[in-house]
Amino acid sequence: MENSNSEASAVWNPALRTDDNHETAATVEEISAPVSSDVAPLTPKATTANTDIVPDAIDSINTESPAREETAELPLNEHTHTVPGAAEPVNVGSAGFIETAEAPPTAIDDPGAVPVAVSPNGETSAPAIATDVTSVSENTVPDVTESSSVEPTALIEIAQAESATGEDFNQAETREEFREEAAELFSAAADENQETDAFKPQAELAAAPGDGYNNLQSMQEEHVQEGQTHQLEIDTSVNAAQGSSDYPTPGWVYQQGIADHATPIDGELRSTNHDLWGSPKSVDNGEDRFFDQLRTQTKPIYFPSEESRFEEGVPLLDGSAEAPVEAAPVEATPVEQAVPQPGQLDRVFEGDEDEDDGFFSSAQQPATENEPQEPVHIQRKSTSQVLDSLNTNRDGVHSPLSPTAEEFNDIIAAAASKSPENVQEPASEEDLAARWQAELSDDDLEVAPVEEDLAAKWQAELDDDDLLLEDEPSDLAQNTAAEVVNGHGVEPNLQALGSPFGTPQNPSKPKPAQSVYTPHQPSTADLVQSVPIPGATPLSSSAPYSTSYFQPRPEPPAPAVRAESFAERPKEGYKSPYDLPEDLAPRRKPATKPVVSSAANVPAPPPRSSSFTAPPPPQSSSGVPVPPINAATLPPASKPNAPVASAPKNFYEELPLPPVRPRSRPAESGRYTPKFNTASPAFVQPPPAAHPVTNPYAQLSGDTPQSQLQQPEKLGPYANNVGSSSQSAPAVPPINSRYSPKPPTLQPGVKPPASPRYSPAPPPPAAASAPLQRYTSQPSVIPGQTVTLPFQPRTSSPLAHHEKVSYQPNEASRKPSFPQPTSPVTGQPSHTETAAPMSPRSSQVQASGPSAVDTSSSYQQTSPPRNPYAPPSYLEEFSRRVSHVNNSTPSAYTPPPETPPFVPPRRSQTQSPTQQQSGPRLSVPSVDPLKRPASVHAPSSPTKTSHTYAPMQPSSHIRTISQSLEFIPPSDGQELDPLQRWKGAPIFKFGFGGTVLSSFPKHVPRYSAGQTAPKIKPMPGDVKTTQLKDVISFPETIVRHPGPLRNKSKKKDLVAWLSSRIAAFENEGVPQNLQAYPDSYKRRDEKILLWKAVRVLVEHDGGMQSTPDLQEALRGILFPHLQTNGLEPMYSDSLQSFGAEVINASSLSDSAESKPLSSIRNNLLIGEREKAVWSAADNRLWGHAMIIASTLDKSIWKQVVQEFVRREVRSNSGNPESLAALYEIFAGNFEESVDELVPPSARAGLQMVSKVDGHGPSKDALAGLESWKDTLGLVLSNRSPEDHRALLALGRLLLSYGRIEAAHICLIFSRAAVFGGPDDPQASIVLLGVDHVHSSPTALLDDDAILLTEAYEYATSVLGASPTSTLPHLLALKLVHAWSLTDQGRKSEAQQYCDAITAALKATTKQSGYHHQHLFFGVDELSARLKQTTGDGGSWISKPSMEKVSSSMWNKFSNFVAGDDSDAASTGSGKGGETGFGPFAQISGTPTVSRSPSVTDLYGQYPMPVAQQVPGAGTSRYQPNNQNAPNSSPDQGRGRSSLDSQRSASFGLSYGQRRGSQEYGHPSESPMYGGGPFYGSPTAGYQSTPPQTSYMPLAPVEEDMAQQAYTPPTATPQGLFGHDLPYQPPAQNPFDQSTGPEAPASQHTEADGYMPPTGNTGYEPPASNTLEVEVTEESEDEKPRKKLTMDDEDDDDIAARAEALKKAEKARKDREADEAFRKAAEADAKKPAPAKSSWWGWIKGGNKEEANSGKPIRAKLGEESSFYYDKELKKWVNKKDPNSATPARATPPPPKAMGPPSRAASGSSMPPSGTAGLGSRPPSVAPPPSGSPAPSSLGLPPTPGLGPARSASTGAVPPAGNASSRPGSSAGPPPRPSTSLSHASSIDDLLGAPQARKGATSRGRKKGRIRDLPHLAYRSVYPCIANYQPPYIVVNLHAISSGSMAWLLVL
């Protein structure tokens, strides 16, 4: 024993002495001789590392855990004492200073070496010790597994490894106290135990520089180089016992006797004797061996005297197996007691476990807790520095112990007292090794047991270290780990010790701890990695020890107790460097991870290189999550670990593997694998093999990161790789997502322990896929490195290699969603990537911070495996710690194998960029620090970043800039073109009919001698002709639109098309045109409602009459969930919007409840008003009942009033707005009803606060808008006289808030909406669903909107049996649609639309301002071009023939006047092409032009008047003078509208002139005309026209004016179809009704053919005169009407004059009418007898006319029979004849009378009424309000007058005003056209097509009937003839035929 002790002391002293003075070195030499083979000497470099390392370590560790930040310097006695827990004697003589810091002292060259300063006297420098001890107490239990002649840094490193756990031996005590306690413990031990050679003075040790010492040093250096950490199981207490010259194990321990301090900081007591355990020093040999084994474990292969060391180690281990308690931290509760030896050792572990502050476990837990503090990167001090720092204690071993030292001693004593039996009993080497490993693993000591048993246990304990973080997450894991740690029945106490140091599960982990300090750790890491491979398999009961990271899953089964923890341990192993301090905190002891014995291995790699930093990153990803997993999984695993005692052999077998480290590094995934193992059992035990690695990775990420974080802290760039490999290696399996390919490889048998960090390079292929999975996106950064990485494990941190490898696979995996679920991809990739990129240790140190840890752990987490495999507890823990990391990891996981090639060249883990990423991952700092070296993490983040983008790069093959070839410039000056157009560019030309011409330039390469690259000669390319539809896909509907809609046969097809479009809208998302609006979803739903509403109208033939079916259909679309046939409760349920109860309903006794209101509301929705009344009465809602009853029979009202007891209290129930609005409507407050929805204050932008309902939640003032459907449904189901006004107000309200679709629904159901062009300020609707006010003009080009509006027009006109088109402005939009069809190549359909437009223009005699030249030309042009392109063969320019032209012109003119088909032909597309095109194209259009022109002339005035505004407008319509000049100029000036652009400028002008003059005098109109975008003039015209000039004919104007005069809404609600203006003036409708029948006919006649003459001022006055005469003769009935219109016109001219004229006109008309009737009666009475036979003919002819005439005809018809009887009697004759004669004449007269009077004074008088009052267009504007009444009249759809009224109102009303004003201005001409036009138009509309008029013309003319359009036209001409000689007329006609309108105008 003494020899062994001396050897051990040599070993210890060398390590200590290296730090110490020369004396120590001598002693070390002496002692090291025997031990040298086994133990790597600790380099005293660490001495300086204490101070130097601490800052760096703190930097790296801070992120990981505060524990790391602290370093524990323990004084070692000069004399080597065998610590019962230590396999080797510890040289206490040299002041052993163990610096434990979360970050491995990068300054220390030997990762395994812990800087220990031992004074020659065996004292450690007090100050240094104080500080160091404090850190040790807080963060780590200094373990001195090995001593290096030069460096005691191994001890320090061990301490650091334990400190990596993040817990101090005694967190509560300061370092000084700890040192003091340790010194006391050591002194006590020295006193009790006989001094052995081990305790010889350092001088002796130095004197014995024999082979042992030198060998140890050399070996240690080798280990450092190898990256293998030497885990010297020297109790920190030994170091702490600065004052004791000897290290008496048992006695010393007993002296301390404090159970709390039962466990030395190391977690192992290394005294010459196993006095600590109460066993004699006989154990010394075993202890020596044990430490040798630990060193060997770190790098056993490297010791030449490895076998001897093992031999010594066995006895020492045997003796110390029990004895070495691994000084469970004072706080640590004995988690693991060696089952084999329940002696003091067990007790010690118990105490540690109970305390739960086991040094390692506490370190681990504190690491987690301290994680936020980010352990300082500890750099090893040089031996001299350590010695200097220890100088204070150098005075003597017996120098007073610092409180920390005393505490340490107490811990040791407690441990000895707890398990004295174990200490005394020298267990067999295997038993000792197993127990020792268990305990060491608990403590996370870096002592490698000699035997594989020890290795297995060691791994388990190291796993515990790895689990340190996990231990915090799950106590279960810790407990299980404790049980498993011993595997021999080690008590939880022992496990507690183990957990403080590391999970006892990983016997090999002690080495990882060494690896933290020594380069050997890579070997340990390899071992750890071997465990990670098992980790790939479920870690849960696989033997962690046997699994040693080198063995695949098979190993884990053997040490099933720790298998899980082992795999995870590796990550813990990263912690293990930190675990020394953590071991102090037994919290880690639970060592759920002990099962993952691999953790032990993990620590080794981390020790040296800054990988310490890297561990933190892994921690965040895998580390954080791992703890829960390890805890949960490891406990079971730890139990198996105990049996795994045999595993240590495997462990040593695996040790040889370190040479293969390249693979093991790839296997670093193995490091993660342990994590996987831990996690795997919970979630993915079956998949663990390869993908399990990924899962394990996720799970391991929790556990492993801790150990990884710890170990990596000390690891050098490569040591980090090893360390993080070993400890974070368990994480590798989780990294499997990251390194998943590798972990599988490692598990199979690759010795991952050391390699995981660096070995990733070899395995990258296997692991690469996993890394790719994890970092799939990052490979791009790695690609270059990938190849080298496999072979550069050392050159760059293995993590870097793994990153790349893992990232590449991850890249693929990241793409898959699977990895994403696991955790955020970013975290994962960043972790690995950072580690890899950051090779420098400095960066490692940086990374070592929690952030670094976070990064790496996040990296691990990134792998999806964590989610799939990690146990919930693990995930929760991890998520709590590293939520950020988790987020990043998920995607990376899926394609783990993907990226082997990307593995970047390894970077020193010190550089690990993890720190960079660590910042974000600080949430998991404690875990990360423990988990992995910073370097590991650092590579992760860079890799992550690179991979994150790398996958993108690989996926999108990097595109290099295409070689720019030189062009051969031209020599003709084109080369000077700054645009270089000579190089050529694609050319596209869009032609008619969707034809596209394209030409791409050709670049011909020209090669010349001596040039490698050719020059480019641009050449013109081929011209290709394609169809636009082949280039641009136009939306196709399943059902083709059946348009144009011209007859009822299209109804079925239209409904099918509407249904298909609605279905498409419902299946589509928000249209692009609505996405910019905040309420886009509401707008989308309302758009669908609008389409459904139009479909309902089509299905019900326009809904002209309200029927139950129609109401039901409307309710179906407004309230799809409402079932009218259901019970009220059903309604209340289905209509929650109506009856939703308010939680905060008013508590007033009389307040209405929401349920009764819902019942009332629902009853009203279905039209059951009486039921609603009694429902309200039953619920005591008397106010509701009374309001509803007021609309019912008086009897019901009386009953309700009798029942009514108290006043109504407004209900506070939800959504009362719609009911309140309905009640307002019932009360007659139509316009104010909308205030119930949105209060005026809200519309004004004010927010009002209610003091009444303050108890309820504040309500959005605009929330009432959402009740528009309820309000509409209530109104439609409960119609009241003027409710359309309320709907109009509601529509306007919605329009003001941009709810276009909802507003249009309300407007169309109000049947009073004004449809007009975009230039019409009165128009509320231009196209359904389009906001023409705020939207761009292009919105009007929407085909869907055009077709929907066409469908509405079809429903209301064709299906509604309306005689005329209700939307004259829509013709121009149909033309736009025709052009759109042409562009799409649908020429036949476009031609159909042209024909339909032409027919519509011909069909109506009263033309709207929208029917202008531009429209005519546009239709003709498009039709002609379509005919040419469709193969008519006709040329664009037909050979002109004067005969054809003249004949066609004359025919067209006559047809135009008569409205015959010939006219249609002239204007129609049929022949228009022939006659209209060519040089005389405009002549051919002249008929059209002549129509327009005359109109144009009329409107030509308007353009001028438009500018003039009202007066101009009014006069201009009828003023020929203005019309003439303006006619041409206005059109031209106006320029073309969008449509007009295609046409001649005159097109726009004519329209504008016409409408402008008619519609408005307002400047607004004129600007609109000028700018009329769409229709050119129509724009202005549209706005004005719908209301005023919707009907170009003057007659309509008269009607409109008359109607306007009749402001009352007598007209029926047909306004639905009419424009607001037409319908708005109800007066028009009633007036039209009376006069309409006759006047319309005349209007049409004049309008169609007659308008041009009207336009001519020359003959208008005469016409008016003549007409007046005729009117008086033919029909005086219409005169009254004319009076109205004339009055309106007069008003336009002059208010006073208008009024006077009106009065005069009215009186005169009345008189004339009476006279006419009298004369007619008399004439008839006279005629009857002679014309008896002919009388029948009169009757026949007259019947038709009489039908038109109306009452007189009917009465006469009845009298006819009497007439026969009384043929001779004049009475009979007088009665009948006058009646029959009068009716025919009477009918014509009104138009005539209208015409002349309106043109003349009468005409002017009428216009004044309309004009003056309405102000031309302005009146129409005013009409909107009147329009509401008009709508009501309109609401009377049945009224036949409506057709005319509607048409008239549409445009006629404004025309009336205009006409009136115009007549006023030009008294003569306007009246006549207005008269005839207005009547003709209305009559024509009612009677039908102009053809009938045609026939009647001759008769009509004779009879003076309006129907005879030709006659009317001539009649209008006749007055001119009467006034002017025929030559004038001839000239006029000739001028028309020749196409020169100027003559006509002049005349």
Swiss-Prot record:
Entries under CDD domains matching the protein: ACE1-Sec16-like
GO cellular component terms listed in the entry, alphabetical order: endoplasmic reticulum exit site; endoplasmic reticulum membrane; ER to Golgi transport vesicle membrane
Ranges of Polar residues composition bias in the record: 361-370, 515-527, 538-550, 696-711, 774-798, 823-833, 840-864, 938-956, 1483-1495, 1538-1547, 1580-1591, 1604-1613
Gene Ontology biological process: autophagy; Golgi organization; intracellular transport; protein localization to endoplasmic reticulum exit site; protein transport; vesicle-mediated transport
Domain of life of the source: Eukaryota
Compositionally biased spans, kind Basic and acidic residues: 565-574, 1694-1727
Disulfide bridge partners, by residue number: none
Matches recorded under Pfam families: Sec16, Sec16_N, TPR_Sec16
Compositionally biased residues, Acidic residues: 465-474
InterPro entries, per database record: Sec16_CCD, Sec16_N, Sec16_Sec23-bd
Low complexity composition-biased segments: 905-918, 1519-1530, 1854-1867
UniProt keyword annotations, A-Z: Autophagy, Endoplasmic reticulum, ER-Golgi transport, Membrane, Protein transport, Transport
Membrane-protein topology: Peripheral membrane protein
Residue span of region Disordered: 1-57, 347-385, 465-956, 1462-1760, 1773-1904
Compositionally biased spans, kind Pro residues: 603-619, 741-766, 893-904
Purpose: Involved in the initiation of assembly of the COPII coat required for the formation of transport vesicles from the endoplasmic reticulum (ER) and the selection of cargo molecules. Also involved in autophagy.
Family: Belongs to the SEC16 family.
Name of this chain's protein: COPII coat assembly protein sec16
Taxonomic source organism: Emericella nidulans (strain FGSC A4 / ATCC 38163 / CBS 112.46 / NRRL 194 / M139)
